[in-house]
Amino acid sequence: MSKTMNKTMNKTMNKTMLATALSLLCGWAAAGTLTVAVLDKEGKPVIDAVVVITPANKSALPKKALPGQVTIAQEKMQFIPAVSLVPVGAKVQFINNDPWDHHVRSSPAGMGQFNATNAGFELRLEGKTDGKPAKPTDITLDKAGVLGATLMGCFIHGSMRGYVYASESPWAAKTNAEGLAIFEDLPDGLAQIKVWQADQLIDALQQQANVSATPAKNTVQLSVVPRRRRV
């Protein structure tokens, strides 16, 4: 191989490596952090509200994806966790840890529960027998009508309520005890913010954020005070 050809190849490789490095650097610089604070009507932080971000660059993905499979337990006549967040198409495993039978019946949450045309899914889970493990049942949230929030209840025990939220956007999170949902490495540019909370029957107004290298914070205040959880 001639020296001229070697020089040409080396120059080409150097240019490629430089372009790759610049691309990675630009990608890093284009990532920003957005914190969304959710408050109730009285200005107190709200835990377990779902915050969904839709960035203008819809091809960008978070470093940590939403779980493709979750387990929801029925225990002490409660759904645990009370709110589950998954992507559309996720598998949800239901398990009854109580010694008596339970149902799982679903319907759209919010105002949709009053005029739902989709009956949702229904399951009957046998009670856990001493010395034997509970038998789980799986549901895949891949059908029309499961997008967004789904209310879960029990025919036998009317006080039982739980929710599963299926998000189309991969940028979604539940608020922590301080009422905060923190999104890192969001692509820069405009982003839509949607907040869902179980007791807010009418969705809160969507907000818009401008994501950049400078950390940003948006505050969303609900028009309700969520019911206190039963422990």
Functional labels for PLM-detected ranges:
Residues 1-17:
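Compositionally biased, intrinsically disordered low-complexity segments enriched
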Residues 23:
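Short coil/turn motifs at helix boundaries and re-entrant loops, enriched in small/polar
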Residues 26-29:
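N-terminal signal peptide c-region/cleavage motif recognized by signal peptidases
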Residues 31-231:
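Extracytoplasmic copper-binding redox domains, predominantly the cupredoxin/blue-copper superfamily
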